[in-house]
């Protein structure tokens, strides 16, 4: 299962979170965000991270040429689109960047109708991410996604669950998508509906961009106690 911690701004925290067990770190490339980090600082952090951890840049309605430049300069190996990017944009982007760069498209879910957008994007992206809808903010709001809405979500693409996840509620959320019993969170779990992992930001923070390592460790302790359905 993928465990992505988003909103990394500090080298020591990024290294510690990777050591604790995260499989992916997210870097916010949106200047207006309180979690914004410059491409230069992203590069400095990435150079000191383990090779096997995914490094994802988060963008909102980016220009493709600027995005491509940031990917090249920072060595990100994935990008997350968290704005109003169209399927046509995603298709153009797919043909403009290397095939080994993962494209994640975030969808902000307010009602079951919003899930229908997933089918439109799946041909052009690698992974979907479901986040809670907020009328003013695009992400990192701490608002919990209504899990009932996505119980019948059956995409063909892998997808990540976000939206107000915390060490306290994460196991309850994940239980809805577990297919096969395992004993350790590090094992290769089997999930239904192509659920592939979780994405947290505010749920493991002291303040925007300042990760709380106590909360991160508590998250992994919670995941380790996960009782898997048969």
UniProtKB/Swiss-Prot annotation:
Keywords tagged on the record: Amino-acid biosynthesis, Aromatic amino acid biosynthesis, Isomerase, Tryptophan biosynthesis
SUPFAM superfamilies reported for this sequence: Ribulose-phoshate binding barrel
Coiled coil: none
UniProt KW Cell division keyword: no
Signal sequence, renumbered to the chain: none
CDD domains membership: PRAI
Superkingdom classification of source: Bacteria
Its EC number(s): 5.3.1.24
One matching Pfam family: PRAI
Pathway it works in: Amino-acid biosynthesis; L-tryptophan biosynthesis; L-tryptophan from chorismate: step 3/5
The keyword Acetylation belongs to this UniProt entry's keyword annotation: no
Record field: catalytic activity: N-(5-phospho-beta-D-ribosyl)anthranilate = 1-(2-carboxyphenylamino)-1-deoxy-D-ribulose 5-phosphate
UniProt family annotation: Belongs to the TrpF family.
NCBIfam families for this protein: PRK01222.1-4
Protein name (record): N-(5'-phosphoribosyl)anthranilate isomerase
